[in-house]
Design a protein with these regions (language model features):
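Loop-helix junctions at membrane interfaces
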Residues: 1-176
Length: 176
């Protein structure tokens, strides 16, 4: 009766798994507040390591749990920086869904690496496309100004962010 009321992905979880997932959510939430500027001259582009935890949750428990970790960890930021939080959630979720889909086909290190490689490309593409909508709202920039930021700032930032999260998650996965 209680299991029927649980959201998708939680029904068959043991209490130990649920506790581990909650700890992953809390860890990601704390790490989401560690924000480091990466691109000189574009201080609003900040890296945070919470995506690492979301990727590990995806590899360990599946895509929907990874999405839950990513979204839940950024809820506090929706109040202070709704556009930045939205962008971070979308970038992380696009990475997670690709990694989870590839890894689920054959759960092994090679598929985790392949999923991360494809996820970096997809996440970067999604982020660049969304930047053409969100950056004008965030900074009052024109389409041309956003386009001029793609190569020197937006593309490197998004690739570095997704790649860093992927590399650390894969190294951590190997230790598990």
């Amino acid at each position: 009766m209680v299991a029927e009321s649980l959201p998708y992905g939680w029904q068959e979880r043991s209490p130990k798994q649920v506790a581990a997932i909650v700890l992953l959510i809390l860890m990601a939430m704390v790490l989401s507040f560690v924000e480091l500027p990466v691109v000189p001259g574009a201080e609003w582009l900040k890296y945070d390591p919470s995506g690492i935890v979301s990727l590990l949750a995806t590899i360990l428990y599946g895509s929907w749990i990874g999405v839950a970790v990513a979204v839940t960890s950024w809820i506090p930021h929706l109040v202070t920086d709704p556009l930045g939080a939205f962008m971070n959630i979308m970038a992380t979720v696009s990475l997670i869904l690709v990694v989870g889909t590839v890894y689920r086909r054959k759960p092994c290190l090679m598929h985790a690496v392949l999923g991360c490689a494809a996820g970096v490309v997809v996440s970067s593409a999604v982020s660049i496309c969304l930047n053409f909508v969100v950056t004008p709202l965030y900074m009052g920039a024109t389409y041309e100004q956003v386009a001029s930021l793609v190569l020197p700032a937006l593309l490197p930032f998004n690739v570095v962010k997704a790649l860093a999260n992927s590399v650390v998650a894969i190294v951590s996965y190997r230790k598990l």
